[in-house]
């Protein structure tokens, strides 16, 4: 059984016990997170109807917060000597899917 869920503006394919990195969510480590399923596949049966999906719930446990790779930004204007160098590291939340079940 697996599900496609919406997490942080993106779609992720998850199954039970998967560890997934999603955009940052304001939750502490150990908290429970409920994700919205967009599609559920259960033993070859595909469920994508909105009325049927309301019967399913995907739960996950928050493992912690991690940072992504550093992105380097350089602004430059020719003939003026203007240079500006910036860096950014995006924060992500790591979760473990604990269950995909009907309500």
Curated annotation (Swiss-Prot):
Pfam families, per the entry: Ribosomal_L21p
TM spans (from-to): none
GO BP term, pick one: translation
Entry keyword set: Ribonucleoprotein, Ribosomal protein, RNA-binding, rRNA-binding
Keyword Chaperone: no
Record note on quaternary structure: Part of the 50S ribosomal subunit. Contacts protein L20.
Gene that this sequence comes from: rplU
GO cellular component: cytoplasm; ribonucleoprotein complex; ribosome
Protein name, entry field: Large ribosomal subunit protein bL21
Record family assignment: Belongs to the bacterial ribosomal protein bL21 family.
Role summary: This protein binds to 23S rRNA in the presence of protein L20.
Protein's organism: Thermobifida fusca (strain YX)
